[in-house]
Amino acid sequence: MSTTRIAAHRGAAGGNIHCNTWVAFEAALAQGADIIELDVSRSADGELFVFHPGMEPAHLGIDTPLSRMEARGIRNLRYLNEDNTPTQLGISTLDEVFEQLKGRCQINLDKFPTCMADIARAVRRHGMTQQVLVKTEAREELFRQVEELAPDLPYMVFARREDTVSEMLRKRFPNYRGTEAIFPDETCGVAQPEYTERMHRLGLQVWVNAIVFDCRRMLAAGHNDDISVAGQPDQGWGWLMDLGADIIQTDWPGMLRAYMNRRETEGRKP
């Protein structure tokens, strides 16, 4: 059985079901996702919502950032669907999503550094410290913030091209889990099988991204969702699995799960 886990990028969206909504999270779990990745925004009066900062014009049709709105106004907003038509789906609070997903899957809380203390308090309030995963860039000032505000949360760092910090961080943070490896081409240090093998020897994990949010920015040297769903999954998801990735983030969790199952049935490298 494949040991690679599937992280659903903002859930599984499509049609009238918008990303980062409770329905998208249910759809992702039904399609076989192991991890739900979601984004966190904070209102002007301090409430945490599940929404990608900066996407207000595209997803809601408004120009005002949620960070400048009060919570009661945010609750009245509705997502737009793929045809730019309002849906019935509002913006969930982080508290609501925590209760929805508690005990069901791991949750990657993206945008963690933007409101680190508030997010960490919410995680503890729901008793979910070992169910979440948080990440930061690999910078000393952020390491110090995590030490102060969230030392009890499972933690990863972004490794862009190379990883120069994991051996230090595993000694510094008891809850250090590994890296989100980002590599625009196959020559990068984190794009080598030797890197994932070394991480595994250290008891650490490597997260990679098959998602494409900008075709001009390669997150995994072109081994992505686009080529996978277009008929070349061996060059996309399969390449990442052969790299030894522990977690693949995708916008197509159902298709990736089906591909993993097919590989296993065919007796290929898990």
Briefly describe each language-model feature range.
Residues 1-270:
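Phosphate-group recognition and catalysis centered on beta-loop-alpha active-site segments
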